[in-house]
Curated annotation (Swiss-Prot):
Cytoplasm found in the keyword field: yes
pH and activity: Optimum pH is 7.0.
Recorded GO MF terms: urease activity
Keywords: Cytoplasm, Hydrolase
Lineage, highest ranks first: Bacteria, Bacillati, Bacillota, Bacilli, Lactobacillales
Protein name stated in the entry: Urease subunit beta
NCBIfam families referenced in this protein's UniProt entry, alphabetically: PRK13203.1, urease_beta
Compartment(s) where it occurs, according to its Swiss-Prot or TrEMBL record: Cytoplasm
Keyword Hydrolase listed: yes
The organism of origin for this protein: Streptococcus salivarius (strain 57.I)
Database matches in InterPro entries: Urease_beta-like, Urease_betasu_sf, Urease_subunit
Enzyme Commission designation: 3.5.1.5
Annotated gene: ureB
């Protein structure tokens, strides 16, 4: 290996493989932009500004690479893909709507 050299996979990385995604339309009705990160419990995201079917979003997060986010500008409507939280499916913090097991 040469210093600074990268060895990358020849195939695309399936970063959220094995999870079934749902589509959800989201509208920002607020007067400021809202940004939601990759591992935020979408059900609890910005109740004042973002309008969407919250029950469909319960237990789900954005289907985007870790460490990234989606930004919703005021008045903007976007369709996002959501996937289930994995692991033991326990949610703590965020806006304190669950604080325990999802199932």
């Amino acid at each position: 290996m040469i210093p600074g050299e990268y060895h990358v996979a020849s195939e695309p990385i399936d970063y959220n493989g094995g999870y079934e995604a749902i589509s959800l339309e989201v509208k920002n009705v607020g007067d400021r932009a809202a940004q939601v990160g990759s591992h935020y419990h979408f059900y609890e995201a910005n109740e004042a500004g973002l309008q969407f079917d919250r029950e469909k979003a319960r237990g789900k997060r954005l289907d985007i690479p870790a460490g990234t986010a989606i930004r919703f500008e005021p008045g903007e409507t976007k369709t996002v893909q959501l996937i289930d939280f994995g692991g033991k499916r326990r949610i703590f913090g965020f806006n304190n709507k669950v604080n325990g097991f999802l199932d």
